[in-house]
């Protein structure tokens, strides 16, 4: 799903990569 993918990219720029890998993206 393209929207989810774009949202994921926006999240990873705001959050640390390690945090993203552990918890996933909840925006």
Curated annotation (Swiss-Prot):
It catalyses: a 1,2-diacyl-sn-glycero-3-phosphocholine + H2O = a 1-acyl-sn-glycero-3-phosphocholine + a fatty acid + H(+). Keywords: Calcium, Hydrolase, Lipid degradation, Lipid metabolism, Neurotoxin, Presynaptic neurotoxin, Secreted, Toxin. One of its GO terms (cellular component) is extracellular region. Its main location: secreted. One of its GO terms (molecular function) is calcium ion binding. It is found in: Secreted. Expressed by the venom gland. The keyword Hydrolase applies. Binds 1 Ca(2+) ion. Coiled coil: none annotated. GO terms for biological process: arachidonate secretion; lipid catabolic process; phospholipid metabolic process. Its EC number is 3.1.1.4. Its cofactor is Ca(2+). Belongs to the phospholipase A2 family. Group I subfamily. Snake venom phospholipase A2 (PLA2) that inhibits neuromuscular transmission by blocking acetylcholine release from the nerve termini. PLA2 catalyzes the calcium-dependent hydrolysis of the 2-acyl groups in 3-sn-phosphoglycerides. This is Phospholipase A2 1. It comes from Micrurus nigrocinctus (Central American coral snake).
